[in-house]
C-alpha cells in the first residue's frame, strides 16, 4: 500500500481558493486570507506548497506547528488551534511569534493571558464561537452544535459555572475579558460549522450570526474587531454522486451575504479568512493497494432474496484509512495496473485487519478477473488518511510519495 500526494493538484486547489476568495472580497474588505488546514495532511512538502501558493497555515498541535516552522512558513502566517493546548504549545506559539492563537474557552483565555504576561508578550487571539448553525454533515464531524467541546456559545448561559454569567453569552464574557487583558491582542473571531459541505448557504448563515455579534460588541465596547474567520469544511467529490461547488462560486455567494449584512448593521467589513483543508489536500491524494485474496459470497437483498457479492482484500485497510469505519465515509476504487474486458461485478474492498468492519469501499463495480497481485487505486485520499493512520495489528504505516 502506498499513498501518492500530487503537487500539481494540491497547488491548483490552493490557488483556486486564494484567487477565488481574494477576487470576491477585494472590493469589500481588501481580499481574503486563506489558511491551509494542516490537520488534513501536513508534511514538510504540503506546508511548503501552501506557503509558496500564498496560503497561510493553520495548525492544531505543537507537532503541526513544528512542521510548519520547519518547512519555512512565516510564523506570522501560522495559526494555532486546539481546544486543550498545553502550556508548552502555548509558550512555543508565543516565542515563535505566530500570527494568531485561536482560543476556545474562557479558561484558556485566562491561562493564555497569564502565560503571555509572564513572557512579556501580547498574545494575538481569535475567539472561536459556536454560531448554532448545523451543517448537513455527519454527526461525528459537525462542530457548530452548542453541546460540543469547541468554541464559545453565542447563546446566553443558564448558570454562573466555569466563568459563565447567567443570562449572558460565554462569547460576550470572553470578549470583555480579552479586551480588558493587557497581554491579549484580540484580533477577531472565528467559527466553523462542520465538514464536507457542498453549498454556500451554511457559511452565509454563520457569517450573518457572527456579524450580528460583532455589532453587539461595537455597541457595548465601542470596538470593531478587525478579523472574521469562517473556518473550513468545504467538501470534495469522493464518489460520482458528490457535487461540490467551485471555490469561486462559494466565495462570490458568501461575499454577497457578508456585504448585505455589514451594510445592514452599519459595520466596517472585517478582514475575512477561511481554512480549507480537505478541499485542497483531498483530491491531491491517491492510495494504491495490492490485491490479495478474492472471494464471492451470497449476500441477502432487501427483497428477501440473495445476490452475489465479491470481496476484494487488499494489503492495507482501516490502519491507513480509518474514515469509512469512523464516519461511514464513501470512496470508490478502480483497477490501476491494467485494462480489463471482463464484466464488472459488484465488489466490496476490504482490508486485512482482524475486524469485520474493516471495509474501505462498501460497493463498487470492479472487473471480474481482478485478482492477486493487481493494483487497486482509491482516489481522493489526500485528506484525513495518512494523518489518521496507525499501526493497528502491527501493520506498517504506508509511505507517502510526493
Where are these regions (language model features)?
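Short, small-residue-biased leader/transition segments that mark boundaries at the very start
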Residues: 2-6
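Short, electropositive alpha-helical surface patch
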Residues: 199-212, 243-252, 286-297
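A glycine-rich phosphate-binding loop feature that marks nucleotide/adenosyl-phosphate handling sites
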Residues: 9, 192, 227-233, 269-281
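Active-site-proximal beta-alpha core segment in soluble small-molecule metabolic enzymes
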Residues: 26-227, 257, 262
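Charged (often Lys/Glu-rich) extended helix/loop segments that serve as interaction or gating elements
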Residues: 253, 259, 263, 267-402
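Short, glycine-/Ser/Thr-/acidic-enriched flexible segments
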Residues: 9, 41, 64, 85, ...
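Catalytic palm subdomain of template-directed nucleic-acid polymerases
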Residues: 236-243
Amino acid at each position: 500500500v502506498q499513498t501518492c500526494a500530487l503537487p500539481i493538484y494540491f497547488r491548483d486547489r490552493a490557488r483556486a481558493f486564494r484567487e477565488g476568495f481574494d477576487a470576491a472580497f477585494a472590493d469589500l474588505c481588501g481580499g481574503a486570507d486563506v489558511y491551509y488546514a494542516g490537520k488534513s495532511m501536513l508534511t514538510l512538502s504540503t506546508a511548503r506548497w501552501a506557503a509558496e501558493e500564498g496560503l497561510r497555515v493553520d495548525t492544531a498541535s505543537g507537532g503541526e506547528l513544528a512542521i510548519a516552522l520547519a518547512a519555512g512558513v512565516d510564523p506570522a502566517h501560522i495559526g494555532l488551534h486546539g481546544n486543550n493546548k498545553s502550556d508548552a504549545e502555548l509558550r512555543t506559539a508565543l516565542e515563535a511569534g505566530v500570527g494568531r492563537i485561536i482560543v476556545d474557552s474562557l479558561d484558556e483565555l485566562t491561562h493564555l493571558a497569564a502565560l503571555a504576561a509572564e513572557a512579556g508578550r501580547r498574545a494575538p487571539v481569535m475567539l472561536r464561537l459556536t454560531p448554532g448553525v448545523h451543517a448537513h454533515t455527519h454527526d461525528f464531524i459537525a462542530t457548530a452544535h452548542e453541546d460540543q467541546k469547541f468554541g464559545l456559545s453565542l447563546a446566553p448561559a443558564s448558570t454562573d459555572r466555569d466563568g459563565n454569567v447567567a443570562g449572558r453569552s460565554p462569547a460576550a464574557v470572553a470578549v470583555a475579558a480579552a479586551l480588558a487583558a493587557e497581554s491579549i491582542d484580540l484580533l477577531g473571531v472565528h467559527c466553523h460549522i462542520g465538514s464536507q459541505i457542498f453549498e454556500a448557504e451554511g457559511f452565509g448563515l454563520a457569517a450573518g450570526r457572527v456579524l450580528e455579534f460583532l455589532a453587539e460588541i461595537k455597541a457595548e465596547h465601542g470596538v470593531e474587531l478587525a478579523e472574521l474567520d469562517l473556518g473550513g469544511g468545504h467538501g470534495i467529490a469522493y464518489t460520482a454522486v458528490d457535487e461540490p461547488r467551485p471555490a469561486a462560486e462559494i466565495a462570490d455567494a458568501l461575499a454577497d451575504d457578508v456585504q448585505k449584512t455589514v451594510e445592514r448593521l452599519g459595520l466596517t467589513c472585517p478582514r475575512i479568512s477561511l481554512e480549507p483543508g480537505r478541499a485542497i489536500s483531498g483530491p491531491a491524494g491517491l492510495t494504491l493497494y495490492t490485491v490479495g485474496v478474492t472471494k464471492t459470497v451470497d449476500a441477502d437483498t432487501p427483497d428477501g432474496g440473495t445476490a452475489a457479492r465479491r470481496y476484494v482484500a487488499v494489503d492495507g485497510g482501516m490502519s491507513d484509512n480509518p474514515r469509512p469505519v469512523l464516519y461511514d465515509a464513501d470512496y470508490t476504487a478502480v483497477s490501476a495496473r491494467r485494462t480489463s474486458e471482463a464484466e464488472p461485478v459488484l465488489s466490496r474492498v476490504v482490508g486485512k485487519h482482524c475486524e469485520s468492519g474493516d471495509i474501505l469501499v462498501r460497493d463498487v463495480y470492479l472487473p471480474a478477473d481482478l485478482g492477486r497481485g493487481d493494483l487497486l487505486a482509491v482516489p481522493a485520499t489526500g485528506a484525513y488518511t495518512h494523518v489518521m493512520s496507525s499501526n493497528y495489528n502491527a501493520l506498517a504505516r504506508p509511505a507517502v510519495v510526493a
